[in-house]
């Protein structure tokens, strides 16, 4: 199905371009969200008549997004979650959680504006891209920690997960002593 794009769509094209897409993508995403029109002769004429208005509206949205981007870019947000000793979360941090945190901090960002490839499942600092407008993208840092104190340590760059560090020489001496006590035939079973 051919559609006329009403705004820039990532990996598809710029505003005003006629592109060929699969019918399901056109119906369920592009047409439903007002990002495109079916490429009929009547719609092509209507688009050309409204092109100046659409470009002005797009420019206005982009300047609003850039104003928000200046405030949001480089910001750091803390999420407190439960996790195991190795730093793996019980559950995950999804785009819904990220949208809630940003909303609580005074930014209006929808969950569809985060471009996470997969949910965050570990403690630590994570850089998350936020698409405020098809032409404006910023990165925020999400600090996932078990407590506010741990979040502060992570922000300073300290490690917070428990790692068992073994001194191999000490371990070797302990194993050797245990074998010596067990007798000469203990290791041959």
Curated annotation (Swiss-Prot):
One Pfam family it belongs to: Ribosomal_L9_N
Single Gene Ontology MF annotation: structural constituent of ribosome
Keywords: Ribonucleoprotein, Ribosomal protein, RNA-binding, rRNA-binding
Gene Ontology terms: biological process: translation
Coiled coil keyword on record: no
Domain of life: Bacteria
GO cellular component: ribonucleoprotein complex; ribosome
Gene3D superfamilies per the UniProt record, alphabetical: Ribosomal protein L9, C-terminal domain, Ribosomal protein L9, N-terminal domain
Family per record: Belongs to the bacterial ribosomal protein bL9 family.
HAMAP family from the UniProt entry: Ribosomal_bL9
Function (record text): Binds to the 23S rRNA.
Name this protein carries in UniProt: Large ribosomal subunit protein bL9
Organism field: Methylobacterium sp. (strain 4-46)
Protein encoded by which gene: rplI
């Amino acid at each position: 199905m051919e559609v006329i794009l009403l705004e820039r769509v990532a990996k598809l094209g710029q505003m005003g371009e006629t592109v060929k897409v699969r019918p399901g993508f056109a119906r369920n995403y592009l047409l439903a969200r007002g990002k495109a029109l079916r490429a009929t002769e009547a719609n092509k004429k209507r688009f050309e008549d409204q092109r100046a208005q659409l470009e002005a509206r797009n420019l206005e949205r982009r300047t609003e997004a850039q104003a928000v981007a200046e405030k949001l870019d480089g910001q750091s947000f803390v999420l407190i979650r439960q996790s195991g000793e190795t730093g793996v979360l019980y559950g995950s941090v999804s785009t819904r959680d990220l949208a809630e945190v940003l909303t609580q901090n005074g930014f209006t960002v929808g969950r569809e504006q985060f471009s996470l490839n997969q949910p965050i499942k570990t403690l630590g600092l994570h850089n998350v891209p936020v698409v405020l407008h098809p032409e404006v993208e910023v990165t925020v840092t999400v600090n996932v920690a078990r407590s506010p104190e741990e979040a502060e340590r992570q922000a300073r760059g300290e490690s917070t997960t428990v790692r068992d560090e073994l001194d191999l020489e000490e371990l070797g001496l302990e194993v050797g002593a245990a074998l010596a006590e067990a007798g000469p035939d203990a290791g041959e079973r």
